[in-house]
Each structure stands twice: as structure tokens, then as C-alpha cells.
Amino acid sequence: MSTPQLIFSGGSGRSGTTVLAKLLRTHPQVRASRPLEIRCLTDSAGLLDVCLGPGADAPLGVRALARSRPLLFAEFRRRLRGRWWERTNRLGKVSGLHRGITPEQRETLLRELQRSVGQDAREAGRSFLLELARMQGLDAERYWVDTSPPNIAHADRIHRLVPQALFVHMVRDGRDTMASVMNESWGPSDPEAAATWWSDRMVAAHRALTEVPADAVLTLSLESLVVTERAEEYRRLLEFLDLPDRPRMRRYFAEQMPAERVRPGSWRERVADPDQVERAYRAAAQRLEALGVPTHEFGPPPP
């Protein structure tokens, strides 16, 4: 069996990663992860932490566990059997890895990781991901795609684990992202906090991607893909993945991703005080520009 190509899509969150996964999985050569966000790779005490050590932003508790790999692995195992296995997502639906593999397959993955991580941690982590993809039914498909939003902020570490991985960075106008996240029960409720939430993630993504080869990264604007440059961006996505166009995928793009679905600039209708959101966004955007981080703002800036 040939080795599947792993694709990791991500972004700030609320930026179109799920939209991308649903489009790609209509192609006969692509299988989407089940669930669309596996979580066990980039979450705290996840596979990256077990195989590479905790990242710079890891919680203190995970740093303490990492002093002993057996303790960190035990926490990984507990979470793989718990919150990553079955959880209620933001839509109130049950999600988790149980949708893609059996408990017996999960335990096989854990046993093999525990056996091999002390010998070659990177190879152990890579093998875990590849075997997970195969267990989820990967057969004739060339690609397996996961769309956990933190993937891009951890792209440098994922690249160390899987050097052949490809990354699709989904971006969206910060004000629409802010409005979207402010309407989530788990999100920041005021514009300043939402602007910080967005800009922090843009900085993390930018820094991580500087450590990844440029030809392994595609940055896609949700607005350009769905609204303003549909044909060009659709073609660019296919070319990046070296995929031939297929009728089912093109039909899905035309019928399920019409331009009116995205409505750039609709943030003004979804917030209580658009002027306050604009001010908070503008201050955050200026900070990003000072750091050399692209904002991917949709449309011309105000005069």
C-alpha cells in the first residue's frame, strides 16, 4: 500500500477550514479525517507534545508532565480514550475519533506508539498519523486531510514530524472573523478581546509558517475562493495538490459554495457596535503590520 499524503488545513478559526474539508472530500482522491478536527495532534498533551516535547505555549501542567515521557504518554492515552474519543462539539453534536476507528484500533495505535516512541519519537508520531489515516478507511485515495484550526499555528512542528506534509492556510477578513467568534458561546464577547484573539492566532500562524518550505504551503482567502476569484482560486487549490478536476467536486463547489454564502463585510450586521469593532480591528491590524504579519483584509482599507 502506498504512503498517503497528509494535508493539514487550519487558520485562526471561523475562517473556512471546515468549508475546505467538505469541498476536498468530494474528490475521489481525498479522504477527510473523521472527525474533521482530530484534536489529538495539536491539543495540549497531544501527539506533537509526546513526540517533540511541549511547544512554547504549552500549559504549565503539560510542561511538568513532559519531564517524564511516561507521564506525558499516560496523559495522552487518557485523553485519547476520553475527550478526543468522544465529545460534544459546538453544534451540540457528538463528535470525536470514535467516528472513524474502533476502540480496538485505538488501543493498537496506543500500544505501538508506547512501544516505539522511546526509540525514534518522530518516526513513531509519523507512523501513528499514517496508521490512523489508513484505519479511517483510506484506500484508493492519495490524500488524507485534517482541518483542526490550530494546525497552521503548529505547522513548524507538524513539518518536523511529517516533512512531506502539505498545509492550506485559510484566512478571512479579521472583522468577519471577530464577529463570528463573538457570536460563539466559547468565544470572546467584546471587540477588543476578539481582536486580540484573532491577531494572536495570525501571529502564531505567520511565525510557524516561516519554518515550513514555501512550496508546502498554500494560503487561501475564504472571500477570494468563494466570492471574488472563484475560478482562479479553485484552480490554484487543485494545482497545489496536483489533483485533476472532477465533476463531483466542481458540482459541489458550484452548488454548495455559492458566492452569496460568505457575504464579506456582513460583520457590520452581526455586531452591536460596528464602529467599536472597526476601531479594535484597526488597532490589531496595525500591530500585525508592524510585525510584518499580513492581515489579509478584504477590500480597500478606509481612507
Residue ranges with predicted function:
Residues 18-30:
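A conserved segment at the C-terminal end of the G1
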Residues 1-8, 182-185, 206-210, 215-217, ...:
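PAPS-dependent sulfotransferases, especially Golgi type II membrane carbohydrate sulfotransferases
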Residues 11-12:
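P-loop (Walker A) phosphate-binding loop of NTP-binding proteins
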Residues 28-32, 166-167:
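Catalytic donor-sugar/metal-binding loop of nucleotide-sugar-dependent glycosyltransferases
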Residues 33-36, 247-249:
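Catalytic beta-strand/loop signature of glycosyltransferases that borders the donor
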Residues 52-62, 188-197, 267-274:
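A polyampholytic, Gly/Pro-enriched intrinsically disordered region
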Residues 35-144:
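PAPS-dependent sulfation machinery
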Residues 103-248, 266:
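PAPS-dependent sulfotransferase catalytic domain
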